[in-house]
A protein has these predicted regions:
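Membrane-interface helix-loop junctions in multi-pass transport and translocation proteins
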Residues: 172-208, 338, 390-424, 433-439
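Helix-terminus/linker motif at the lipid-water interface of multi-pass membrane proteins
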Residues: 30-51, 117-124, 180-191, 250-283, ...
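Interfacial/gating helices of multi-pass transporter permease domains
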Residues: 14, 37-63, 125-131, 193-194, ...
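Interhelical loop/hinge segments that connect adjacent transmembrane helices in multipass membrane
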Residues: 1-20, 129, 189-201, 209-253, ...
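Small-residue-rich hydrophobic transmembrane alpha-helices
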Residues: 41, 50-103, 147-156, 273-330, ...
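Short membrane-interface helical motifs at transmembrane helix boundaries
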Residues: 104-135, 322-349
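Alpha-helical transmembrane segments of multi-pass membrane transporters/permeases
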Residues: 85, 153-180, 194-197, 201, ...
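Alpha-helical transmembrane segments of multi-pass membrane proteins
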Residues: 111, 124-150, 280-283, 342-368
Length: 442
């Protein structure tokens, strides 16, 4: 099959409607996150950014749980989505296990928030305030873990309108509550960064109630159906997929937390890095992650076709996104200074430009990872993570001990970028091997 024919068929079968729905679900949180960053920029000094940025290492820990539990659902529930009873059972039992694990994690954070904040080399003047903020954030985080679970189910059921609704509710409530708790408006309580935690908790509770109600109606479930006998026998298959996904995330995030996040705290650039990351993940990658989620869904079913017909559209759209990044560079400074309300915008944009080539590689890398998730081949993710992080960050540690590597904002960014580049090489080789094993069928 020629390249032109494969590309034409691939774009023809691409689920534009679901992609649009997923894109909107990504746009909406970005809007309230941007408003939130703008409000933080009005707090005198940089302590607001610095304290809020410390949730990053907590999120890295939570990401391990999420990638071990939530992302494998594309495969574990995707293979039974046509079976009502089995789907209900997997959602019911899966949410129970997820909630239990998040609660355990929350208790650990509540008990050791201060010690962990000190270990991450946060400014001593803000350790107490940071620990308090992190403890408050765990309420909303635990509630929203259940929402994430149900969003995966809604994606598999192609319930676009309810994906819109969930994020719409989250945006409206978050902006309204941030304005009341955080902003410098006349009616605001002006609670500082803690206002973010209160907003997240209330918004997460409201969206969770909506998501559970929608799923119950879709499956014609009453309250008693949620309490009926739970069959946990499928946990073995969930564990088989999730253990490698979790291992991948654990290795990747522990190295990132120590060598990137902690080092940024040491050189006192955590606020700069947090805003730059917010711009990259909130805006540059905005249209990309819905694309990756759609590819997970597209490759999770039992029916296979030629990989060119299935994936060319995804890689083509990713290429267009990368071109748009380059075209919009002249406008980044204005956006960061005016919209994100960051005074040190030149340093932030400079950091983003250093990372840009690596994030172009990252975009293709993540699409290949999405195929691994969709096919339940998470052991490949674990292998690439171990190889990449041990080789790159292990080398950096040796060079640091030899006084060859000196941590600065630029060198830390280049270290992170090198990790992405090496990971991309490893991922491509494994993706090629997967295609050979499947005779090019996905």
């Amino acid at each position: 099959m020629s390249l032109k024919i494969s590309a034409t068929k691939s774009f023809g079968r691409f689920n534009w409607k679901l992609y649009t729905a997923l894109l909107l679900t990504a746009v909406l949180p970005t809007i309230y996150t941007t408003v939130r960053i703008n409000y933080l920029g009005n707090i005198p000094g940089d302590w607001g950014f610095n304290i809020a940025s410390q949730l990053a290492w907590v999120n890295l820990m939570l990401e391990v749980v999420q990638e071990a539990l939530i992302l494998p659902l594309f495969y574990c529930i995707g293979i039974t989505i046509a079976n009502r009873e089995e789907t209900i059972n997997r959602v019911r039992t899966g949410m129970t296990v997820t909630l239990g694990l998040y609660l355990v994690f929350t208790v650990v954070i509540l008990l050791f928030a201060t010690q962990l904040t000190e270990w991450m080399a946060q400014n001593p003047d803000t350790i107490s305030a940071t620990a308090e903020y992190i403890r408050l954030e765990m309420v909303g985080t635990t509630l929203f873990s259940m929402v994430r679970f149900l969003i995966i189910v809604f994606i598999l059921l192609d319930m676009k309108e309810h994906i819109y609704a969930i994020l719409g509710i989250q945006v409206v409530t978050s902006i309204a509550l941030d304005s009341y708790f955080l902003s410098d408006l006349d009616f605001s309580l002006q609670l500082g960064v803690n206002g973010i935690a209160y907003s997240n908790a209330i918004a997460s509770f409201i969206t969770l109630v909506y998501a559970i109600t929608v799923f119950s109606r879709k499956m014609d479930m009453g309250f008693s159906d949620w309490k009926e006998s739970h069959d946990y026998s499928w946990m073995g298959s969930w564990w088989d997929v999730g253990k490698y996904s979790g291992l991948d995330s654990f290795v990747r995030n522990i190295f990132y937390m120590i060598f990137i996040v902690k080092m940024m705290n040491v050189v006192e650039e955590q606020g700069t890095y947090w805003v730059a990351n917010g711009f990259i993940w909130g805006w540059l990658l905005l249209p990309f992650y819905p694309l990756a989620d759609l590819l997970k869904q597209d490759t999770s079913g039992p029916n296979t076709i030629d990989h060119k017909e299935k994936t060319y559209a995804y890689f083509g759209i990713a290429t267009v996104m990368c071109i748009l990044w380059i075209v919009t560079i002249p406008f980044w400074g204005t956006f960061v200074s005016e919209v994100l309300n960051a005074s040190d915008y030149e340093k932030i944009v400079g950091l983003v430009l250093i990372l840009l080539p690596f994030y172009i590689l990252f975009s293709y890398n993540t699409l290949m990872d999405s195929v691994f998730y969709g096919k339940g081949r998470t052991e490949l993710l674990a292998i690439q993570s171990i190889v990449t992080n041990v080789s790159v960050y292990g080398t950096a540690f040796i060079l640091f001990k030899m006084d060859v590597f000196s941590p600065t904002l630029t060198t830390i960014a280049l270290l992170f970028g090198t990790g992405i580049a090496v990971d991309s090489i490893v991922t491509f080789s494994m993706y090629r091997k997967l295609l050979q094993e499947s005779n090019g069928m996905l």
